[in-house]
Amino acid sequence: MFRRGDNSNFNVQNSFFLPLEYEYTVKDNVPSKKKSSIGFFPLDDSLFTSKNNSGHHKSEQLHRGNAETIRSQFGTDAVPIRIDEKEGKWDRIQDDNSSNLNYQINNSNDPASSGKYTQSIDCNHIAESKFSKKNGNIDSLRSNSATFMLNTADEDVIEFSFDDNVPYAELLSGATLEKCSLTLNEINKKLFNTLYDFRVSKDNPEENLVELILPNCVVLLNFFEDIELLADSSDEAFEKSTFINTIEFIVHDIWVETLIKNINLLQMFDADLKCYNDKYIICKLKGQYPSTNIVDIMCRLKHFSNSILETFKFGIELKEQDQCHNRNTIINYVLFSRVFSTIVLEIQKCFILIVKFMYSVNFLEKFSDEVFLSFIEILIKIVFEHQIPQLFLGIDEIIQLWLKNNEGKRQQLLSAWCNGTVQDMKQSQQRESSNAESESITSSTEEDEEGLQFNKWDVIEPFIDNIKALNQSKSHM
């Protein structure tokens, strides 16, 4: 599904709803001219903390202070720089702890820039975001030093090791690693750090989810496809909790941060939120975060019961009941549904990439079967609620990966899940048929050639049959 691409000029900025089998490019996703414009923003790590995290993992949580250390690259030299956002100062820290102000800050009040505050450092670009770690540097956990060959479009081939200050962001910006040698745990740590550092921080983050997150996940996938895995030593066991929390971080970035940055779309009808049925969404909009645990997020996604058409219908009902006083409220609900569905879709695409990566390095076997089936259930629900049948292509692929090289238990789990899904669909159809209002909406939609809904059973039935056939073929092998 996700293959290497040849088109270095491929632009994925507006490709929210591309079919998932589309061939994403993995080379030069971020042009060199734009590298310097990619920023990072610190997040309060307390938002990531899950109640289910073990005490051992909590001791390894990453913390940020008010001052963030950034390394700027001058050839092979790296100079730490401290950012004090309150005073607008960039202090270059010398070895003798003295400050040598060698920087340039531009405060732009030009109306053409929409009042945006911009900062620029007199250096090539900000290469890496560094942050302190509670129990020492992750590099100290590595048992040996691996060597890479880094190729970029505008630089000569350079050789470096883990001890050098080569930024993770550079590895994600069109660079390809030709050779390396890592243990399984080192891969886990590297992925964790890379995705933690690389954040969406542009003015319109919802337009950059695919542009920044997905291509870099693809780069990671292709990078890890070619690595040589070393056997983990007895004292360096694979840390499942760290990998699961890596996924939580990705979801948190896309889900929470993007939704919060789009809160301006909802301020116009904030008074009408009390009429909105989804309490979880209201909770999110008010800035309350019940949990960032991946399983909790999956479960709460089920409670979003409004497709675009259903949201529009709900707005009309409010109008008829005089609960809203102008048609702008209806339009705002539709706008919010579009933004929300886009965010959800990008989360699902990221999950497909993550699951594919997990399989490529044998992580899929370590992933909880219950979490996996919850993930599949969420994907199917998103297909129905947001009318994205192309997503079935990705669902089918990751199910096949999940079943591969695993006989017995997973086949039984999948068979039981399919039977339960079919039963739920039949019960749902019976409820819809007994509801006169639902019947009228369905009939009117079927008459409209441009209707937003499709017959759910016509889609899910062959899909379930496909899975059952696949399941049977696996069980007979």
From Swiss-Prot:
The keyword Signal does not apply. Keywords: Cytoplasm, Sporulation. GO terms for biological process: ascospore formation; ascospore wall assembly; positive regulation of ascospore-type prospore membrane formation. Residues 432-444 have a biased composition (Low complexity). GO terms for cellular component: cytoplasm. Its main location: cytoplasm. Residues 428-452 are annotated as: Disordered. It is found in: Cytoplasm. The keyword Cytoplasm applies. It comes from the Eukaryota. Required for spore wall assembly and ascus formation. This is Sporulation-specific protein 77.
